[in-house]
């Protein structure tokens, strides 16, 4: 899950489910609430631990947000329940076309992201997320996004580095059948050092 903390304004949390076999991401839940800070961050961590057994958070750490992972009550709760708190810093890399927020665009285009739309609550959450996606600007000119919230978009993007790592780890452990392009050799029949 990703957490975009806020001391004032809106704090956002976003939870993805990742299916390794289909390589698809599923939006499980999100929360976007006014106010925030440490009490709200701890509250969402507790709620989602109970509800989803969530044990990995990627938390933005620009400025004040660094205090979230350093807070004693959050550290104690995370330590007691085996929750990994991973920090991330965004700065200008959120606008990077390869690793930034807009790098998620092909996932939507290739239908590798599934957003739930069954039921009123799911529709409200998805509509809010989609509206923030529409107004998120990949341009570094911030004047385009003045007045537009992007908390949910950012919270949904924070776990992407972790998800990409999981994808690479899965590929690295896959058993691939290898057929050499040359014939006549068996792996066990070569008995010479041809490189000498």
Residue positions per predicted region:
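RNase H-like, metal-dependent nuclease domains and their acidic two-metal-ion catalytic environment used
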Residues: 1-87, 114-196
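Conserved beta-strand -> loop -> alpha-helix junction used to position metal-binding or nucleic-acid-contacting
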Residues: 77-110
């Amino acid at each position: 899950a990703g957490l975009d903390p806020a001391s004032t304004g809106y704090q956002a949390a976003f939870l993805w489910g990742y299916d390794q076999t289909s390589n698809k991401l599923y939006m499980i839940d999100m929360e976007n609430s006014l106010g925030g800070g440490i009490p709200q961050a701890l509250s969402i961590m507790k709620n989602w631990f109970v509800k989803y057994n969530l044990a990995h958070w990627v938390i933005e750490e620009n400025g004040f947000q660094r205090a979230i992972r350093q807070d004693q009550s959050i550290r104690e709760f995370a330590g007691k329940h085996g929750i990994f708190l991973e920090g991330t810093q965004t700065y200008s890399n959120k606008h990077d076309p390869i690793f930034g927020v807009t790098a998620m665009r092909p996932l939507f285009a290739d239908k590798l992201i599934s957003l739930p739309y069954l039921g009123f609550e799911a529709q409200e959450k998805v509509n809010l997320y989609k509206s923030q996606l529409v107004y998120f600007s990949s341009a570094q000119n911030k004047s385009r996004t003045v007045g537009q919230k992007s908390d949910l978009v950012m919270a949904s993007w924070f776990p992407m580095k972790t998800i990409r790592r999981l994808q690479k780890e899965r590929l690295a452990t896959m058993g691939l059948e290898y057929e050499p392009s040359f014939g006549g050799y068996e792996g066990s029949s070569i008995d010479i050092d041809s490189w000498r």
